[in-house]
Regions:
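Short, conserved secondary-structure transition motifs
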Residues: 3-17
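Divalent metal-binding acidic/histidine catalytic loops
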Residues: 12-14, 20-164
Length: 164
């Protein structure tokens, strides 16, 4: 019986199969000193406007790079983080304190949703569904659009993306 695969937990129940990265999240919170952090109900502030020149330069760019890389890996089982992580990954070249604070906010959100993952229900009709959305030039700094999609088979996502 499969329990772990490439750091992803595989939980088999009567309802179906769930993939999760609970253990990875707990290690991530420990690594970045956020095991006792204040919980958040959303990954980012609502209507957050952020660009490459927001705030002051951070002296912790290595930590920022590590956080973004870790969060990108986490999107394997947490597609709900894709937009936020994609937005913040655009500032890898010159991260600012605001960008670092936003990545830490995502970790605070993740700390409250540790048990989230993707559930593939065993009694669901197998049907391929796709959804897409775009903000059409929503990023004011360069007037570029952000678009995204998700495809699900049965009850669980099988492919997703968010791109600028």
């Amino acid at each position: 019986e499969l329990y772990y695969f490439l750091g992803i937990e595989v939980i088999q129940t009567r309802v179906g199969i769930m993939i999760s990265q609970r253990h990875y999240i707990l290690n991530l919170l420990y690594k970045f000193g956020m095991t006792e952090c204040k919980p958040m109900t959303t990954p980012l502030e609502r209507n957050l406007k952020i660009d490459a020149s927001s705030g002051t330069a951070t002296s912790e760019s290595i930590q920022y790079h590590q956080l973004i890389g870790s969060l990108i890996y986490l999107t394997i089982t947490r597609p709900n983080l894709s937009y936020s992580v994609n937005l913040l990954s655009q500032f890898m070249q010159n991260p600012r304190n605001l960008h670092l604070n936003c990545t830490k906010r995502i970790l605070r959100y993740v700390s409250t949703t540790v048990d989230y993952g993707i559930l593939y229900k065993s009694n669901t009709t197998i049907r391929l569904e796709g959804y897409t959305d775009a903000d059409w030039a929503g990023y004011k700094a360069d007037r570029r659009s952000t678009s995204g999609f998700v495809f699900s088979l049965g009850s669980g996502a099988i492919s997703w993306s968010s791109k600028k």
